[in-house]
Curated annotation (Swiss-Prot):
Its EC number is 2.7.1.19. This is Phosphoribulokinase, chloroplastic. Belongs to the phosphoribulokinase family. Disulfide bonds join C61-C100. Pfam families: PRK (PF00485).
Amino acid sequence: MAVSTIYSTQALNSTHFLTSSSSSKQVFLYRRQPQTNRRFNTLITCAQETIVIGLAADSGCGKSTFMRRLTSVFGGAAKPPKGGNPDSNTLISDTTTVICLDDYHSLDRYGRKEQKVTALDPRANDFDLMYEQVKALKNGIAVEKPIYNHVTGLLDPPELIQPPKILVIEGLHPMFDERVRDLLDFSIYLDISNEVKFAWKIQRDMAERGHSLESIKASIEARKPDFDAFIDPQKQYADAVIEVLPTTLIPDDNEGKVLRVRLIMKEGVKYFSPVYLFDEGSTISWIPCGRKLTCSYPGIKFNYEPDSYFDHEVSVLEMDGQFDRLDELIYVESHLSNLSTKFYGEVTQQMLKHADFPGSNNGTGLFQTIVGLKIRDLYEQLIANKATARAEAKA
């Protein structure tokens, strides 16, 4: 196993590093000789395998909740690095490390204002450094990653990130740069419709932050051109898309409380088999039995069908409506196949464990949980396949 010892510029003057155009952004690599720095006592061991997952979405679209569900599938709660910056955006568990791509902003809040660009604009982000560091982590090499401070809007000193078993990069641009995109083992896009996004933002910003309706509308409109140009097109590259739409069960519903959620799964993705309802490849419309699944108005409806999405063959599983009792979800789970669960009822168990998470009574929570289980299965298949390949190479 290779060993990498990582030092900051202050710790050691050395020419053995990869660097971007800014001298403060460096990835230090020491592969052969284990070293110990007495001041920092930093000895980093490379992970045997690191797989990289990309999660793209606009701000306020549920990325944080999704990450909490995903890390829970692998066990253990994700927390900021111990002893590090209290404003760090990074979350670390025993198996996963989640990096927020806001940390690769090249302009702080004041710089963006001066340059008249939003954080969605590629000119406000350092894709060279993003690529270098994601590649390094994927190859088992620790990095000194910058921190974007969401409280102050400034760029803080970097933090040391060690290579995990599973690296998740989440934010606005995980699939924007082709070099970064090619490093991903699996990718997800959260596609929230304009109507639902507006309803959610009103609920959050008016109720929790005291913003006016006019300011909320202005904020959404100001971001929309850059969102349409730089963020939304990434969904064509995603292996799975969770699409959140207004319900069709309530005519002219504008509140965004009852949702129609579609899980769009690309066919032919290595180590990933789409989930299906009843019969794979068929077109199914299903209203569950009211005696087995308690649902208040407007009820609940599932659909499943093969389809095409950006010229790719996909399978689409849809849920419209919401649950009243999560323990009854086992009835729905029993009719779904290819869930990649370890035991009967694992989806229901995961949903009950996080019943207080947003979306736990509708398709957003259900499909996030399912995708988390599929990612676990993908990871296990990847590791097993690489182990087999190594064994065959030695034979």
